[in-house]
Amino acid sequence: MKPDNIGFTLDGDLKVFDFGLCTCVRQRGKCVLSYEMTGNTGSLRYMAPEVALRQSYSEKVDVYSYGVILWQMASDTTPFKGLTKTEFMRRIIRGGERPKIPVLWPSQFGSLLRACWDHDPRIRPSFEKVVLLLDIMMKSRILQ
């Protein structure tokens, strides 16, 4: 997932598109929640560490990417701008560096972003939880 694959319809509805690299996993007509995918696809700056390291991964890679996109939207800054691929691999993928969260941002929002970026995908929240927490933050005017 990356910003280039997010857009709006003429009616203003948000859409995610370009599913050329996605994988639908089904077993007996049901989606499988636990599966293994491998490969090094996508845009590095939004890529979860396990994808960049060519390890098995799950849907939690999209939670990581979404967290980076949320940070980019809130900061109006391209994440990891100016890093070479080698620097990115050393600092971000292997070193665990993440985008800086400004002190003035709501702490709940910062905590959510950090959870989305956790190096361990098992620690990352589900998309359902991310949506729920963002909804709570918006309704309580923590995010505006």
For the regions a protein language model found, what residue spans apply to each?
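A conserved short helix/loop substructure at the end of the activation segment
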Residues: 118-129
